[in-house]
């Protein structure tokens, strides 16, 4: 059992990010954005190895590698590309009410969910869809809405790591992981006084 507490000596990050919002009509607003990111550890020789990885860095000079080199790798939770687009529709009905519909789509490339770059803990690229339908007063005083998040029920790995003591106690590799919420559907009511 052992843990290494260390940090990268240096890293390089570069990228491009853009956001936009367009009132396409009196009733439709389109929003979107994207980010392209290039992250690389330029010097990270003292990384904690995941269970089962072959160490490749000898820091104490005794001829036996103890740690893993992550030089040249990207960082945890960093995807090369992310993008989103949303459509917000607001249409007056009757004399004082309004119907609203909001649809958004989010996409991200794959990324490592583990700080030790365990290949068992890579989140594949995914697309997430969300929607909101509402009816309310045009003045904004009240509104009722139905919300649906993660309509395609994506299982998104947000963090993971080696299970402590699993290798020494049971002699087998084991991981723990945290996932974002699956599909959720809810009702929302708003009254402003």
Residue ranges and their predicted role:
Residues 106-114, 135-193:
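C-terminal beta-signal and adjacent terminal beta-strands/loops
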Residues 5-7, 72-76, 118-122, 174-178:
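Outer-membrane beta-barrel domain signature
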Residues 1-4, 46-56, 117-123, 160-170:
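Flexible, surface-exposed loop regions and adjacent strand-edge segments
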Residues 12-14, 79-83, 125-129, 181-185:
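Residues that define the transmembrane beta-barrel architecture of outer-membrane proteins
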């Amino acid at each position: 059992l052992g843990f290494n507490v260390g940090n990268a000596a240096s890293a390089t990050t570069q990228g491009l990010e853009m956001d936009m919002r367009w009132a396409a009509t009196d009733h439709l607003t389109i929003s979107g954005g994207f980010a392209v990111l290039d992250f690389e550890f330029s010097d990270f020789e003292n990384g904690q190895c995941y269970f089962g990885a072959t160490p490749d860095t000898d820091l104490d000079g005794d001829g036996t590698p103890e740690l893993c080199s992550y030089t040249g790798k990207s960082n945890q939770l960093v995807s090369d590309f992310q993008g989103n687009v949303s459509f917000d529709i607001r249409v007056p009905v009757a004399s004082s009410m309004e119907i609203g519909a909001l649809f958004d789509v989010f996409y991200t490339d794959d990324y490592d969910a583990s700080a030790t770059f365990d290949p068992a803990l890579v989140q594949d690229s995914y697309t997430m869809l969300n929607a909101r339908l509402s009816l309310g007063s045009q003045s904004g005083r009240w509104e009722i809405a139905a919300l649906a998040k993660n309509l395609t029920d994506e299982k998104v790995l947000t963090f993971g790591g080696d299970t402590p003591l699993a290798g020494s106690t049971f002699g087998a590799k084991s991981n723990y992981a945290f996932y974002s919420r699956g599909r959720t559907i809810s009702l929302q009511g708003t009254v402003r006084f």
